[in-house]
Amino acid sequence: PDYSSAASDVYKRQSKDLTKDEERLALPIMGRVQSFDNPWDVYAMSTYNTITSLSESRIDENILYAGTDDGIIQHTKDGGQNWTKITVDKLPETPSSAFVNDIKADLHNTETAYVLLDNHKFGDYKPYIFKTTNGGKKWVSITNGIPDGTLVWRIVQDHVNPNLLFLGTEYGVYISLNQGDNWHKFSNGLPTIPVRDLAIQKRENDLVLATFGRSFYVLDDYSPLRDMTEENLSKEGVIFEPRKALQYNQVSGDNSSNGGQTYYASNPQYGANITYYVKNAPESMKTKRKKLERAKKDADIPFPGWDALDKENAEQKNQVILVVKNKAGEIVSKISGPLKKGVSRVNWNLTSSIPTTVKASSRSSRGWRGSGGGITTQVDPGKYDLFLKKRVNGVVSDLAGPVELEVEKIRSGTLSNPMADKHDQYYADLAEFSKVVSSYQHMFEKANARVRTYQRMLMQITTNIPEASSSLYELTETMNMLERKVGGSKAKAEVGEKDFLTISDRLSNARGGWYPNSYGPTQLHMESFDIAKEMFKRIKPEMDAYFENVEKTGKILEEAGAAILLD
């Protein structure tokens, strides 16, 4: 090989030819050397007798390993002045024709290296993986857990934990937690496809895969795998140390005018992606039944019965609850996740919610939209504690924690916030007022629905009730009047003509600075809040009187024998 120490401007020879340097056309094909006049297709083949893999030690630049396509491993400890050669047939149960797919110097130990071999061109599909721990003097096979018939293409080692290895194979990715002594399939979510190359993005701890299907895959933040120790795996639950969560304002939309040839994947979810482990999780009734059915294989599978199936359908799902607390011990957020055996992930979007009201129905009257559902604010940068709990059959118990999470703003705002000391109290007051407004919204919608229903009920009564008829007329007039005061003119809305700002509009403006910004509240926010409170103060007595009259009319209809109203 050649090397350059001048930013690739000049290369210098670092060794003699490290291959067998054979004449390809003089080698036997199909049992004998062929005539030159026989058809050849060397255009479709790579050059033979070449170095196919080269690795420099991260610890000592003088240590290099080279592997060739004609079955040779070479290594040097003096920067290429002297090379030690070993043919692959000297490795345990390895044919001399094996191709060196990959060779890697260990990132943590100068005496350790790994090599992957491939002999499929000769009809041999065995996995050949070897490791040396004495500088290439002896190589041992490390294929425990790799099925026979699985070609191996690429190996990479974690730059932090020397025991953590990743292996790209013909049928996906494998992982070792003990430096190759055992391998485990690690391809959940991947298609069955040859993984021809692997790389680690060290800053983000991401594993990048390149496949023979012309695709790339990225495993975001695999760092929890470093802590997959026997001690941790023996615990009931573990929260793996999360990486620092970066706080910023997201840009909406992934792309605009890139056409149909855009080649990209979704970014990781914004916020903190938190990985946790659960040792044991209760199986659902359906899972238990299916497991028993699979065990019967070709035998008859009995019908479980309708009662059992109904119980399966009605069974409530168990879950984990990730609790986020600030350093004062106050709960900032709670996130639910799946309760299942093994490793799972949940996402926290770095916000805290101030609850206001929640509606079972999503329908809203004009002018009230957006006044319920809670207020969401960005959390302050700093350190938080994570706790993992499980909820099984309604009972909540602890699993793990606390584990610290740091939240950091990507950059400070250009403007200092003169109202920073009033920020929290302002939005707390806004949330309390929103609760009241949302409650009246719900009562108003419910009262309006009753009035419309009373109109139908009145037509079903056989007796004449003038009092109810006139009362319903007045109620309908009041309802229409209040809807105009709350939501504005229907006629203007039909044609898009501007109208007065409603309570909802004012509240929306008052909320305008809370998310995704941490600036404010501004003078405009506070003035909008004050106007909303004044508008509500004026209309509240009229609402109360309307609700009272709706109740009175309902009693009149009930006494007259009308149908029972089911709210």
Stretches found by the model and what they are:
Residues 387, 403-405, 436-567:
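Mature extracytoplasmic or organellar-lumen-exposed domains after removal of signal/transit peptides
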Residues 15-45, 88-93, 146, 235, ...:
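Surface-exposed loop and turn segments in beta-propeller and other repeat-based domains
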Residues 1-11:
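Single conserved hydrophobic/aromatic residue that forms the stacking wall/gate
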Residues 22-35, 90-101, 143-156, 184-204:
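Conserved blade-ending motifs and adjacent loop-strand segments that build the rim/top face
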Residues 23-53, 110-112, 248-263, 302-306, ...:
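Surface-exposed acidic, glycine/proline-enriched linker/cap segments
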Residues 72-75, 82, 128-131, 138, ...:
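A short loop-to-beta-strand structural motif that recurs across blades of beta-propeller domains
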Residues 252-319, 345, 423, 427, ...:
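Contiguous beta-strand segments within globular domains
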Residues 96, 331-380, 401:
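Glycine-centered tight-turn motifs at strand-turn-strand junctions
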